[in-house]
Amino acid sequence: MTKTLVFGHKNPDTDTICSAISYAELKKAQGADIEAVRLGELNSETAFVLDYFQVTAPRLVETVANEVSEVALVDHNERQQSVDDIDDVTVVAVVDHHRIANFETSDPLYYRAEPVGCTTTILLKMFRENEVEVSKTVAGLMLSAIISDTLLFQSPTCTEEDKVAAEKLALIADVDIQAYGMEMLKAGADVSKKTVAELLLDAKEFNMNGSKVEIAQINVVDVNDVLSRRAEVEALMTQNIVDKGLDLYLFVITNILTNDSVGIAIGSKTAVVEEAYGVKFVENQAPLKGVVSRKKQVVPILTDTFAK
């Protein structure tokens, strides 16, 4: 039997890690030889989740072609967000809830993408469709992913399907959604011990009409906890622009209590962000009122503005 590795995007978040583990458990129950791995370090929120449910973190890998010939992707499809040697392996499955971009294969594959707030919402359906029981531990991981991606159902990406899935998973996991959810989000929003690199850890790269754009996001309970270190943050952002040849680096600092954000933008295309949101950056900083979702409120708007 051919072994498969399953993983989410680089700079993994809670959905990426929990989806990889959950997908692997589903496939193992069906007799597959599969292992969940990760493409980067865990953030503090995900570390809290794994510790809470006593789950070992997936193994860290930098390449996969040296181990397997087939892989499955969760929570992403764009090649620049995936493992560096993605072109050297065959993608046999994708389960995702993002736009489809910069993705093609030479062979047919299983592709499941739905416009919901979280990948594990889709995975719960797959467990049910295949009549595979969701364990208490996996239910906890899947619930955590939904809470994370929907900001405890406050994000505009959240759908009724996500809420229903979360309720079902909470029953299996035997946790109180609101109490556990706030504890989890606050664990992720504590930036007091984070390095500057860790502040920018949740970053994704996009190709927007030929421009290289990187968008990082962090959730906090007070944006000033990050803005007080703005000089260090901007220095690292600038270094990333040089190292990666980026045209724009946008850092979205989201207050999970007010559901507003502050943006820091650096690069030759910062005017595109100003046009997209009708704001003016002063010393690289501007308010982004009501913006909490990179997937729904940042990427589509910037993509459309770059295309003008």
UniProtKB/Swiss-Prot annotation:
Keyword Manganese: yes
Molecular function via GO: inorganic diphosphate phosphatase activity; manganese ion binding
Keywords: Cytoplasm, Hydrolase, Manganese, Metal-binding
Sequence positions that bind Mn(2+) 2: D15, D75, H97, D149
Signal peptide positions (record): none
GO CC terms: cytoplasm
Cofactor(s) recorded in Swiss-Prot or TrEMBL: Mn(2+)
Compartment annotation: Cytoplasm
Note accompanying the cofactor annotation: Binds 2 manganese ions per subunit.
Pfam families: DHH (PF01368), DHHA2 (PF02833)
Annotated residues for binding of Mn(2+) 1: H9, D13, D75
EC assignment: 3.6.1.1
Annotated HAMAP family: PPase_C (MF_00207)
Membership in a protein family: Belongs to the PPase class C family.
Protein name: Probable manganese-dependent inorganic pyrophosphatase
Annotated organism of origin: Listeria innocua serovar 6a (strain ATCC BAA-680 / CLIP 11262)
